[in-house]
Amino acid sequence: MLPTPSQFHYLFNMRELSKVFQGLILAERDRFRENDRFVQPFGGKVKSPEAYLVALWRHECERVFCDKLTTHEDKDWGDKLIMKLIDETYGEDIRAQVEDRVYFVDFLRPPKVDEETGETVDANPSYYESTESLDSLRVVAMARQATFNETSKSLKLDLVLFEDVLKHMMRISRLLCMERGSALLIGVGGSGKQSLTRLAAYIAGAFPFQIQITKTYNQANLFEDLKSLYKVAGLKGQKVAFIFTDAEVKDESFLEYINQILMTGEVAGLFPK
């Protein structure tokens, strides 16, 4: 799959391969133990820890490689290639177990509560594991949306969590649980991209950060906002979800600074040495 003038982003290198392994090592290791009566159902047709690992690998390959593809034909080609590799490497039994897609998320478990004091120890426990079905995931997502609306004083979410919305939310949530995870969300205005990102950020325990554009907003203002963002993330150790829309690109130089954040995690000259 090579880049073309209309699909110039079809570029794949070792960075993509490393992201697959990043996803693999996020997984909850208890799910790979044999004969563990505490292990919940794997999801789909998966019946063994070996097939569970292969299902996880398939999921990560789809997130890293197939999600970059823009046409149904290309996505089908990518999926068939993945399944062919599984069949050739692991055989028919494993292939049959992972034939149905298994989705992985990190927000299925309820908040951890101290049994003695009743206080919440961890409001967003992160365990990257499979979900039994999209229906069970929808129940969790709806509960989180209801909690968000109860705690938010200004913004209220009213997302209809149909299948495609759930899949997009899973993609965003996966990226938010990774170091410097990022996504480019493309769609018509008003389709819910920002609302979905805010819900995913809330579920991940990340602080949603967005600049406030004015007529006089310039590079100096952007730097001040970025300093505030880095102080929240660096000094306070708070997870941050930086939401940046096309309407906020007041100057072409803004994109260069965003690119620096994505590539290195730093902005040259932001803080004096």
Question: What role is predicted for each listed range?
Answer:
Residues 220-247:
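Conserved alpha-helical scaffold flanking the Walker A/P-loop in AAA+ ATPase domains
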Residues 243-273:
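Conserved AAA+/SF3 P-loop NTPase catalytic/coupling segment centered on the Walker-B
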